[in-house]
Amino acid sequence: MTGSLSEIKVRITSTQKTGKITSAMKMVSSAKLVKSEQAAKDFQIYASKIRQITTDLLHSDLRKGSSNPMLISRPIKKTAYIVITSDKGLVGAYNSTILKAVMDTIKDYHPKGDDYTIISIGGMGSDFFRARHIPVAFELRGLEDNPSFEEVNRIISKSVEMYKNELFDELYVCYSHHINSLTSQVRVEKMLPISDLDADEASEDNVANFELEPSREAILEQLLPQYAESLIYGAIIDAKTAEHAAGMTAMQTATDNADKVIEDLTKLYNRVRQAAITQEITEIVAGANALD
């Protein structure tokens, strides 16, 4: 009986240590989430501005049809998917839901298996695809908790350049969209060719206030790739925010589970201890009766 008490006590101590670790990790994820949400809000100011400027400059082109390759749909021979996952686990179902959505998309739209490629951001996704011999054009691992544009610029600009060079004909980003600390939504969004600019949102009055040099066309030649890059970067920031929220929720759940286990083990410990005391009393009484 004493051995059982010792074993239960060890399990309680071990679970308490685990609970302290998961509680600390939850607090870390919570702090990261706050920073990431603020970064996302700050980026939206830039994203809204570049979207408005791009739409205004394209005002006439959107209505009559632009010849810029960033806007023109061409026959689809190959599709690229930027898949954003985490580098580590302990984020609940964050990675599995994204990867399931990607695999479902591949199954539905690419039965031949040779008309798509993956651009992977995050080690979990890279390892998943390579283990299944799914083509990965290139990857990025070790992303910071709040990535700067400089950190991801190479993979973003490379993706846009590959599209311009017709190495693939459309580009999607697969990621988890952050809604709040408890909710996220997997999205598979088309980024190229650019199709989210609405001519009705354009204002010729805004363009009239611009001094365009050397020309509108020359500016758009530089601006459209930057706009596409901003869309991808925005998705990365959004995904990181969702990742931190998932990590915080997972660690809170783990802490709650640890508390429940400790509670159950403590009750078990008390029952076993009470049984041991009762057994000892019974033996003492029996011994005393034997002496009488």
Swiss-Prot record:
The keyword Transport applies. CDD domains: F1-ATPase_gamma. It comes from the Bacteria. PROSITE patterns: ATPASE_GAMMA. Pfam families: ATP-synt. F-type ATPases have 2 components, CF(1) - the catalytic core - and CF(0) - the membrane proton channel. CF(1) has five subunits: alpha(3), beta(3), gamma(1), delta(1), epsilon(1). CF(0) has three main subunits: a, b and c. One of its GO terms (biological process) is proton motive force-driven plasma membrane ATP synthesis. It comes from Streptococcus mutans serotype c (strain ATCC 700610 / UA159). The keyword Disulfide bond does not apply. Produces ATP from ADP in the presence of a proton gradient across the membrane. The gamma chain is believed to be important in regulating ATPase activity and the flow of protons through the CF(0) complex. One of its GO terms (molecular function) is ATP binding. This is ATP synthase gamma chain. It is found in: Cell membrane. Keywords: ATP synthesis, Cell membrane, CF(1), Hydrogen ion transport, Ion transport, Membrane, Transport. Belongs to the ATPase gamma chain family. InterPro entries: ATP_synth_F1_ATPase_gsu, ATP_synth_F1_gsu, ATP_synth_F1_gsu_CS. It is a peripheral membrane protein. GO terms for cellular component: plasma membrane; proton-transporting ATP synthase complex.
